Amino acid sequence: MLFSSSSSSLNSEVSQVFSENISSRSTTLTESSTQSEIRQHFGNEDFSGELPKKLIQLKKLKNGGTTIKKAKEDLEYCYDSLRLYENPYVTSSVDKKCGYSIELYLDNKYKTLMFSDLQLNADYPLYYDSSLDNISTNVERERATPLQIKGKIRINIDREDQALLITSHSISLKCFTKEYACFVNSETSKNSYSDKIIKELNHTEFFESSTYPKQQLRVIHHSLNDKKILLTKGTYDYPFTFTLQANTFPASFSSFFGKTHFRIESLTTIMRIPSKPKNLLKFLKNESFTDKIILTEEIKVKRVLPSTSMLKFETFQLRSYNTASEIVVSVIGNSKLIEIGMPFQMILSITKTDSSIELQEASLAVAQRMAIPSIDLKTKKILREPYIKKSEYLLRTVESQSFDSDKTIFGFCFDDVVIPTYADGLPSWFKTFYCEPSSFYPNHAALKVTHLLLFRITYSRNELVEGLEMKKNYRITVNFPILVGDSDISTSSLLPKYEKFENISDLQDEPPLYSMVAGENSL
């Protein structure tokens, strides 16, 4: 990689010995390379053949939580990336005493990656139920356009009497995950909560999965086996590029049943050179002058619907009734896709054939089903029925005063039903659709979040019970599976904004004169 620097105050002979030009580095992650990384990191539980690992907290490091002083080259430093309080994102390290700074630069456009590869399976869409099995290869993901992350590491040395020796320098894209499962004692009753334990799944007993990356992609600018690079006063840029193919990384997610999290991590190992070292060879062997600088930035990965998906424009209609067909409920929805913060339309029709029936209330809610694998506590095998956490969020109610007892047909049109944004009060437990493969159980999902629209109609009628007339309450529930996403879910299907021409002169068949173009450029 080529880099520029200002004039050096050190001996030119020393500079020639330790300086070299390094070409620009980039790397591409494919499905095969991802699996290779998984085998590399979790192939042996005791991590034989790898460096011993030391657990650290970034917030306790020097220079604003970035620098390990007197770092050991025979140790690999790990931190729990999902504990943001202990390990916050820090993108710059400044050492005023030694006169240098290191910064991680990443444009905002690279901080969120959106793959248009959310394949829902046309025959039986994934969002229809909470089943975790038969998660097949996603063909749509394989066709999606690769995405890139571009950035640079800038090293700046301010002082004439100081210099740095770069012994190693790399940039990594790391994926950290937490997977959970419900361990069930199959010999006892299935309804006994005391025999169900939800635990985190780990690849190794020594470290939590969130401490060591599930997958990572690395660009190495300089390794320990290379010659050391001498940097004197000046500014040095190290650009990097990651190219990500679809179907390699899971999407970002955070809940009490599972997490997936990404970081860009810059790792630079330096040796601080004093202004007048008495013995250069002795100095180079002295590890007390070695520092390791860790810089990190958050990356989000999203899956959105491909441009070929028409789910947003698909309507649905369904009908339900009680056993005696005394109450008939019809529901029409304008879309099978509901975006958080965007209004949608629902039409409710209720018909009663028995005038003695009294309608009490109607409600519309969105139900969430969050499923994780169920594991037999003894055999450790995955069970067919997953553990499902059920929750509901009420959207709209119709009170009893809206039902005239003399009528037999009631119609309600909800034009502005909205699942609010988190800023407007949506609880944090509510999540959008999510389904990603498990690292532990092939062809099964690690976590699946699905949703239903629930219409509930409560009514009462008088009945004879042991010769006495009593009022009994009943309920009819109409539900329909929907896909809930955020504002980006249908980005790929949006058409360019229509701009109306003001007059016919806006439509020009002939190009402008060269003299006019030249005149504009000369201004």
Swiss-Prot record:
The keyword Kinase does not apply. GO terms for biological process: meiotic cell cycle; sporulation resulting in formation of a cellular spore. This is Sporulation protein 23. Keywords: Meiosis, Sporulation. Regulates expression of PIS1. Interacts with SPO1 in meiosis. It comes from the Eukaryota. The lineage of its organism: Eukaryota, Fungi, Dikarya, Ascomycota, Saccharomycotina. Signal peptide: none annotated. It holds the Pfam family Arrestin_N. Disruption phenotype: Has a moderate sporulation defect. InterPro entries: Arrestin-like_C, Arrestin-like_N.
